[in-house]
Amino acid sequence: MKYNELWNWGTTGSWKKDDGTDTQYKYEVINSVLYIAFQGSDSKLDWWQNFSFWKKPYKRMKKIWFAHAGFLKKWKSVEKAIANAIIDEAFNRVVIFGFSQGAGIATLCHEWIWFTYPALRDKLSTIVCGSPRVIGTFSKISERFDNLNRFSIVKDIVTKVPFFWMFYKHVGSNNRFKGNYPFYCIVKNHMAYYEYL
């Protein structure tokens, strides 16, 4: 899929849902590619989890690292379903997509696939738009995000939180766009990614 097609597929349509955390996700094999997407904030519970920005250690790792507690909880609630999709589906590549809160979850999904399935590392790519920071500053796992491409608009406030002084960082490569709207147009700046893809 081209980026604009991925945007359309990854932001619309029907979703699977974990009721406990209200995490919406979907996956589909198209032309031998397993596409996985996570929906952005869509409910009060989503917003509560966005603001659950304390860091939690990612458990059962030799190399301890920390992640955004709200996004980690959402990711863990759907991890098994994504694992089943990887086991059950036939594919040659994996492409993960997320927008806004979905980008935070997609970042954790990317890391999990990279760590859990070494044979998929060269076949894995992730595109996130309007992603908040997800990973703790002192987490030494940057190499796990070589194939993660972030799209950010300079004036998009969502890409600035949690703030760097809270010891969070972005991961992956960044494709930055100036944006067409004044800084105070918060919603317009955040929703404008489709204009650049």
What are these regions (language model features)?
Residues M1-F97, Q101-L197:
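Non-catalytic, mobile gating and regulatory segments of ester bond hydrolases
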